[in-house]
Amino acid sequence: MSITIKKASEIAKLRRANEIVAKTLDYLKQEVRSGVSLKELNRMGESYIQSLGARAAFKGLYGFPAGVCTSVNEVIIHGIPNDYILQEGDIVGLDIGTEVDGWYGDSAVTLSVGNISPSDVSLIACAKDALYYAISIIEPEMRFKELSYALEQFILARGYVPLR
């Protein structure tokens, strides 16, 4: 599978959906703190998405019950918001998708709740650096397999092992 270049009109539609994702993540970043539940973060995220004229794309997708995926600590991705209350030292991933007029936006962030261990700081930095590395090397018609291999090598060189 190759990466398809979109037309300017399609990019504008994708941009709108992704702007709402970015605004929602920025909003939720301010709410991530000790004492807040994952269900509350989801409620705030869904309401905010709707207030901006979009639909929470993940809600109902394959039966997923929420608009915001909340992954805490050992949960890798696509965690379901529950009654868990965030605590100092937690690492939380927020993954959000929006739909506007049939066009989708999707992004995620990893955040710390207060202070986290140096090893956790290093792991998060590696993930962020890997993202920027991928952006710097991606080219039109590049195959996902090629990009995945390059990222694997980047991560291994930093002393981490990608999930399989």
Language-model features, listed with the residues they occupy:
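Active-site neighborhoods and metal-handling regions in enzymes and metal-associated proteins
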Residues: 1-164
